[in-house]
């Protein structure tokens, strides 16, 4: 508002009745009194105008104080129009997206105005890629819910949609944690969690393909293909950022060890630092509750699940220790996502036994749900017990132990089964001095897992379908993207057969072929380092999955193994000898960062 001006009739430059010296007051007393009245009236008017001016100024200031958006009005007192979003920084986006498997898809997803800030730092581009993945994940969850809502009466589709919703909730949580970890600079954690988020999305996509009998499902499958690519793009950027830092020009597309790409390594496997020996199950733990099969005055629970249910749901860092006394516990145990740092301590292998027999031969059963013990809560640990699935080999997939627990340690534990005994599904897991027994793909999943000083035993199938011999693969790793920080590492392990199986093998060695692994997914990764491989391992060492699938993209490595099954002269050409200068990549500290979370000191 413009400032008011004084009226010309009473301005300082105007003539007044009292301005002339020729006017004499004594000539007319009435006129003098009138002049005085005029002066008084003029003064009142002047004071009134000044008051109005002050009020207007203060009022305007007050409005500006309480309404910041009006602090800089235009000349006509209207607010300025909103500034449109800056155009996307295409050059920087293109550079970052060149480090992904799907660069064009990546650029398109990040080119919406305002999606990436002007002149962005590499971390800001990564954040934007995570955000795009997250928003599409939320849309995917809505699509799955719609499938579930429309699938009443269809058992298989209902089961798949239900499992999808469950694992996508884990994907959502891991994606949220990834974004926080990138901000705080914990890039190894970020990569581990985004690797899991991607695995869950892929698993849902794979499950949907088994029930693609409606247009709604087919369209959702197509949507999830795009989501998997978006998440993989974000993960690819994280890998390059971890390897090359802010120098985006140096970023490269995800590559494998066979391409000559090796991650940076810290302490070596044989450095004498004692790092490997000092990692494992913590000492000095005191039980919070005790489980006894037949009860007792010192035992609060009779089942393991009751004890798990009693653990607090808070995001605690203190371990909740469950002591499980000797006995055979016939039950299905689930450690849910909200139960963190749960610990099982038994009375020894073969003494404390948790047993079940769920398998995919049962109507509506899936591999994921068949586990005798399934763990989702982070920080899970176990020691001195046996977990088994007694379903026979002809029942096909029948999991004894399934883990999606990050920062997980299992020491001096036994896992018994046939096909798919140990499902190391996702995240970072450490198995030390364990005994793992099975026959077909009996260590499988898409986790980053290290097996140290373990006995790996091939068991007899007792199969009516495979009389006279069969092929067995120990591992089936499921890495789906080269940017995932996952794989199986076997350090100082013994690879042999059970006593019963070795009798069968020696009676008919040509009829029994045993392999270190086969590629379940395209970028399968498994290595054996300083292991003893007995004669039951076939000279070619590794087994194809189906034709030439994944043979150009997998990484199967060996280093300084011993025993009659370790000779590499007849190995398949798509396996590798690990260069000595790079073997430290697979240490417990480097591969799963166990030096940060698996100290033997409680």
Curated annotation (Swiss-Prot):
Give the span(s) annotated as Pectinesterase 64. 288-595
Chain residues that bind substrate: 367, 397, 518, 520
Keyword annotations for this protein, in alphabetical order, are: Aspartyl esterase, Disulfide bond, Glycoprotein, Hydrolase, Membrane, Transmembrane, Transmembrane helix
Pathway membership of this protein? Glycan metabolism; pectin degradation; 2-dehydro-3-deoxy-D-gluconate from pectin: step 1/5
**Which pairs are disulfide-linked?**
434-454
**Which positions, given as ranges, span the membrane?**
36-56
Can the keyword Disulfide bond be found in this entry's annotation? Answer: yes
Topologically, how does it sit relative to the membrane? Single-pass membrane protein
State which residues carry a glycan (glycosylated): 98, 156, 212, 229, 315, 492, 496
UniProt-annotated stretches for the region Disordered: 62-91
Q: What is this protein called?
A: Probable pectinesterase/pectinesterase inhibitor 64
Task: Give the organism the record lists.
Answer: Arabidopsis thaliana
């Amino acid at each position: 508002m413009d400032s008011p001006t004084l009226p010309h009739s009473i301005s300082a430059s105007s003539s007044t009745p009292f301005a002339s010296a020729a006017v004499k007051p004594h000539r007319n007393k009435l006129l003098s009194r009138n002049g005085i009245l005029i002066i008084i009236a003029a003064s009142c008017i002047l004071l009134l105008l000044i008051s109005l001016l002050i009020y207007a100024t203060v009022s305007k200031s007050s409005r500006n104080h309480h309404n910041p958006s009006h602090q800089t009005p235009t000349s006509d007192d209207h607010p300025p129009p909103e500034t449109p979003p800056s155009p996307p920084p295409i050059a920087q986006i293109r550079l970052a997206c060149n480090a992904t498997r799907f660069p064009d898809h990546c650029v398109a997803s990040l080119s919406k105005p305002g999606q990436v800030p002007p002149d962005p730092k590499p971390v800001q581009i990564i954040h934007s890629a995570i955000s795009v993945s997250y928003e599409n994940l939320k849309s995917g969850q809505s699509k799955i819910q719609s499938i579930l809502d429309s699938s009443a009466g269809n058992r298989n589709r209902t089961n798949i949609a239900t499992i999808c919703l469950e694992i996508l909730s884990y994907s959502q949580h891991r994606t949220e944690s990834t974004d926080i970890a990138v901000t705080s600079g914990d890039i190894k954690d970020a990569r581990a969690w985004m690797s899991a988020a991607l695995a869950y999305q892929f698993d849902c996509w794979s499950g949907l393909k088994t029930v693609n009998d409606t247009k709604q499902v087919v369209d959702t499958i197509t949507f999830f293909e795009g989501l998997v690519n978006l998440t993989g793009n974000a993960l690819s950027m994280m890998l390059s950022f971890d390897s090359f830092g802010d120098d985006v020009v140096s970023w490269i597309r995800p590559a494998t060890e066979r391409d000559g790409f090796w991650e940076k390594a810290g302490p070596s496997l044989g450095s004498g630092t004692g790092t490997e020996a000092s990692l494992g199950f913590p000492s000095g733990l005191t039980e919070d509750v005790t489980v006894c099969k037949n009860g007792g005055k010192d035992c609060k629970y009779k089942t393991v699940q009751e004890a798990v249910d009693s653990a607090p749901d808070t995001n605690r860092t203190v371990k909740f220790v469950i002591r499980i006394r000797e006995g055979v516990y016939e039950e299905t145990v689930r450690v849910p996502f909200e139960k963190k740092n749960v610990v099982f301590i038994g009375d020894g292998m073969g003494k404390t036994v948790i047993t079940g027999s769920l398998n995919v031969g049962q109507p509506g059963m899936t591999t994921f749900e068949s586990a005798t013990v399934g763990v989702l809560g982070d920080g899970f640990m176990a020691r001195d017990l046996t977990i088994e699935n007694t379903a026979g080999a002809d029942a096909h997939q029948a999991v004894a132990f399934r883990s999606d627990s990050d920062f997980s340690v299992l020491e001096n534990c036994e896992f018994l089964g046939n096909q798919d005994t140990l499902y190391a599904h996702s995240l970072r897991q450490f198995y030390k001095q364990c005994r793992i027994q099975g026959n077909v793909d009996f260590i499988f999943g898409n986790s980053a897992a290290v097996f140290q000083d373990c006995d790996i035993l091939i068991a007899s199938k007792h199969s009516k379908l495979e009389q006279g011999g069969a092929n067995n693969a120990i591992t089936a790793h499921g890495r789906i993207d080269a940017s995932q920080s996952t794989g199986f590492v076997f350090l100082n392990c013994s690879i042999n057969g059970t006593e019963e199986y070795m009798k069968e093998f020696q009676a008919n060695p040509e009829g029994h072929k045993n392999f270190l692994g086969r590629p379940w997914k395209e970028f399968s990764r498994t290595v054996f380092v300083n292991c003893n491989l007995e004669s039951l391992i076939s000279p070619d060492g590794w087994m194809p999955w189906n034709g030439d699938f994944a043979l150009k993209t997998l990484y199967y490595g060996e280093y300084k193994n011993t025993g009659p099954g370790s000779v590499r002269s007849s190995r398949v050409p798509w396996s590798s000898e690990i260069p000595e200068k790079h073997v430290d990549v697979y240490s417990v500290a480097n591969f799963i960062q166990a030096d940060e979370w698996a100290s033997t000191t409680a």
